[in-house]
Amino acid sequence: MKVTDVRMRKLVTDSRMKALASITLDEAFVIHDLRVIDGNNGLFVAMPSKRTSDGEFRDIAHPINSEMRQEIQEAVMKVYDETEAVEPGTIATSEVSSQLEESDSDKTLSEDLKA
């Protein structure tokens, strides 16, 4: 399973949440409401979650292995970094090449960003 598209909306906020993202897997399945969070150890991608009746948060969707989690993290953060100049509140997209180059474990994103 590969991340084939990332859509991101940067937020204008003083909170730790910096952006919301949606990812497409294998051009067939979309997961909405991933969050880019500014944590104690830097930026990271949080999976969509909901609050349970006891006040805890539980992931709605999440990868079950570290390789998929890393691929999602890299794809989302790549778009976040590439859209540094995009006005907050604007939706930015970047399609991930369907022929991902696996050299040195680097995932490459296509160069066309749409605002």
Curated annotation (Swiss-Prot):
It comes from Macrococcus caseolyticus (strain JCSC5402). Residues 88-115 are annotated as: Disordered. This is Putative septation protein SpoVG. It comes from the Bacteria. Could be involved in septation. Belongs to the SpoVG family. The lineage of its organism: Bacteria, Bacillati, Bacillota, Bacilli, Bacillales. One of its GO terms (biological process) is sporulation resulting in formation of a cellular spore. Keywords: Cell cycle, Cell division, Septation. PANTHER family: SEPTATION PROTEIN SPOVG-RELATED.
